[in-house]
């Protein structure tokens, strides 16, 4: 949250410090089950009902306690995972979903985690402040050969306010995603006449590799 909403001059200012925020907790931190994805949907529906414009989701799934439910690369088509199907429809409701690409880049999985494979969402990878890709940042393409992540933001030594209320730094696409989410919020504020899908495409076109895209 501090990546977006912090507003303490000379300490830290987030990327959308004047935005109003709602927090939703949708998963059981002590287990990994498909049910967590079912819990996510009501949060999105409630956000829609109260007029939320931009949503950040710093979570993703590809392994579960029941290993038979683990996703495979061929499942990353934006339609197989329940959460990805739900995410793909958010822009049709007039909201923009910004989500973390995942931190599996150095493991055997490597790929973007659902819902980051969804269509009509902004999937965010991580870079350092020097512009270099974070080695842990999950990569694409999707199984149906769409470019993912869509863009990147700082996720290595990202500035945050810790749970103790003190300035700190952290690594992960869980931080690059809200940093980008705040930027998207300010962009939409400046161009309120644009629809959600137009904002998504505008952000994609802002990347410095838009003319020669790669999968990282």
Task: Give the ranges of each region predicted by the language model.
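Subtilisin-like serine protease catalytic core
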Residues: 1-36, 50, 66, 92-94, ...
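Structural detector of well-ordered beta-strand residues that form the stable sheet scaffold
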Residues: 22, 96-98, 123, 152, ...
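Carbohydrate-associated surface elements
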Residues: 127
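Internal glycine-rich alpha/beta core junctions
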Residues: 137-158
